[in-house]
């Protein structure tokens, strides 16, 4: 057995000026790229895939560089093209993810959750003819309701400047009744 890992490096370009920056560098076609759609091509000798997706409520493109040795070249190309737009480098922003209602696997949910618990019940079609694993269990949860539910809460306390690494227990009279999964 030989394991072959793809040489792919992701870079996100997001924010209100992301479409303008991407069009300046790659062409106006990026405006027509649908959400969760992608295009694979070669830009000035740099093999890339551009996808219209994102992990915040902001307009976002993900660039998948298919040759790590071209990373600096791609970064400089984007950076120079964005100077007139007053762009800046950033990192993951949990606030935007939470405000946008975007779930993160292991932060907000895991394999023990069902769609009713995490607000994804709109994706379930129990009336379809086709059978699928868990259909009867989901039908029962649909009738009885979920035992727990992911929800937001606002707590008046001192500000939290870092997101929590672990789920923190929620207690009532010393009994664990839930957990705080992602906080900002």
Which sequence ranges carry the predicted segments?
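Conserved, structured C-terminal
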Residues: 1-184
